[in-house]
């Protein structure tokens, strides 16, 4: 093990198998916090390869608590975080729009690592229980079409790195591979990433992990979401191939806004923003969700273009269907908890 760690310290790439070996040591609690921190920072400085990302993602999935759901029907739209944008919870809001379109959404997420409010924080503020049993998550996916999968709950072995990640206060490979490790077997996925240089590589990794279709995007301002502030870069994985594209908000009939227009706050403030969007309140928050939900619908294959996705997302919010998904999730969750 020391030899493998030294390879990373010496800026040498690891094979997929070597990374799996180190990850297994971490997830079984056999590496000290000091060594984990040194490893993560050395890997960050060196730069993570597709082989390394796939290796650690597979190791995480092997020790995850599995959530049963028909293979190939659910999707996720969580991002890596770590973009330092301090935006509101865009992907969490968009998830209710995707669910309203009839797409089962297994929303994988965590508490805040490098922002004021993570998806788990805002979900709790909305009244969503983030510690449901796996069978309850399955029930909600079947009955409502959306369930929140709290990362530390479904990945209990991540307890060995949580304190280290929080103390480092900077994105690591775990930000990159977190969205790759959903315990539900996904067929499609939208994944935002804070590093534009890893778009193609990450799309390839999603293919290696069994996705049939996926979009990996990096927004203007290097956000891990699609942004109204300028040009968005994204990679589309389909049929074993990756193609790179760009898209500006004007391309799909949306107005440009500066990044400051979508600044969020703490969990309470972000929950209020989420509700305002689902209520259809016009402005930068709504348009940002329309763009991101549009990308999600496109990634799923529900629509043929992002433009069609934006139009459908607008209809789903105007009709009240997206807002109803939030209400249904809370209602059926109470039913589960009452058993």
Curated annotation (Swiss-Prot):
Record GO biological process: L-tryptophan biosynthetic process
PANTHER family: ANTHRANILATE PHOSPHORIBOSYLTRANSFERASE
Annotated organism of origin: Listeria monocytogenes serotype 4a (strain HCC23)
Record-listed Mg(2+) 1 binding positions: 91, 225
Name of the featured protein: Anthranilate phosphoribosyltransferase
Pfam families in the record: Glycos_trans_3N, Glycos_transf_3
Residues reported in the UniProt entry to bind anthranilate 2: 165
Residues at which 5-phospho-alpha-D-ribose 1-diphosphate binds: 79, 82-83, 87, 89-92, 107-115, 119
Listed pathway(s): Amino-acid biosynthesis; L-tryptophan biosynthesis; L-tryptophan from chorismate: step 2/5
């Amino acid at each position: 093990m020391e030899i493998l760690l030294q390879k990373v310290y010496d800026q040498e790439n690891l094979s997929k198998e070597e990374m799996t070996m180190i990850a297994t040591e971490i997830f079984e609690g056999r590496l000290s916090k000091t060594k984990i921190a040194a490893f993560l920072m050395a890997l960050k400085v060196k730069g993570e390869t597709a082989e390394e990302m796939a290796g650690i993602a597979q190791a995480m999935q092997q020790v995850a608590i599995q959530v049963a759901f028909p293979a190939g029907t659910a999707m996720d739209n969580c991002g890596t975080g770590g973009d330092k944008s301090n935006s509101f919870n865009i992907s969490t809001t968009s998830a209710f729009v995707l669910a309203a379109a009839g797409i089962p959404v297994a929303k994988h997420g965590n508490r805040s690592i490098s922002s004021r409010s993570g998806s788990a924080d805002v979900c709790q503020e909305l009244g969503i229980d983030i510690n449901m049993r796996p069978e309850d998550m399955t029930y909600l996916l079947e009955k409502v079409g959306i369930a929140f999968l709290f990362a530390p709950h479904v990945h209990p072995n991540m307890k060995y790195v949580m304190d280290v990640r929080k103390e480092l206060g900077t994105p690591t490979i775990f930000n990159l591979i977190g969205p790759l490790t959903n315990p539900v077997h996904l067929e499609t996925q939208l994944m935002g990433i804070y590093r534009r240089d890893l778009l193609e590589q990450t799309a390839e990794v999603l293919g290696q992990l069994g996705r049939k279709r996926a979009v990996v995007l990096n927004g203007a301002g290097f956000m891990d979401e699609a942004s109204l502030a300028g040009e968005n870069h994204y990679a589309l994985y389909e049929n074993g191939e990756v193609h790179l594209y760009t898209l500006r908000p004007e391309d799909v009939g949306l107005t440009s806004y500066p990044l400051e227009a979508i600044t969020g706050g703490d969990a309470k403030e972000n929950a209020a923003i989420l509700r305002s969007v689902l209520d259809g309140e016009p402005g930068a928050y709504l348009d940002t969700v329309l763009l991101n939900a549009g990308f999600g619908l496109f990634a799923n294959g529900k629509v043929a273009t992002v433009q069609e996705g934006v139009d459908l997302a607008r209809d789903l919010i105007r009709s009240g269907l997206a807002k109803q998904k939030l209400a249904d999730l809370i209602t059926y969750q109470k039913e589960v908890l009452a058993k």
